[in-house]
Amino acid sequence: MKKGIHPNYAEVTAKCSCGNEIKTRSTVGHDLNLDVCGNCHPFYTGKQRDVASGGRVDRFNKRFSIPGSK
């Protein structure tokens, strides 16, 4: 391999807002701050909310439906 053309590959720490620290290696060169990680993400913790917002058809039917009819 040629000398001096490859980026520095060093150990960095990714710190989550929940306090979890993940040690990894990267070419970034400094520690990373994360918003969410596997310990606090709603999908992985089971605290996921089900959003039933509907689609375009539901919005159209709601807007142009006749009051009192089903």
Swiss-Prot record:
Required cofactors, per record?
Answer: Zn(2+)
GO BP term (any one): translation
**Per its UniProt record, what Pfam families does this chain match?**
Ribosomal_L31
* Cofactor binding remark: Binds 1 zinc ion per subunit.
- SUPFAM superfamilies according to UniProt: L28p-like
Query: Which InterPro entries does the record cross-reference, listed alphabetically?
Result: Ribosomal_bL28/bL31-like_sf, Ribosomal_bL31, Ribosomal_bL31_A, Ribosomal_bL31_sf
NCBIfam families recorded for this chain? L31, PRK00019.1
Q: What does this protein do?
A: Binds the 23S rRNA.
State the protein's name.
Large ribosomal subunit protein bL31
Q: Which organism is it from?
A: Erwinia tasmaniensis (strain DSM 17950 / CFBP 7177 / CIP 109463 / NCPPB 4357 / Et1/99)
Recall the taxonomic lineage recorded for the source organism: Bacteria, Pseudomonadati, Pseudomonadota, Gammaproteobacteria, Enterobacterales
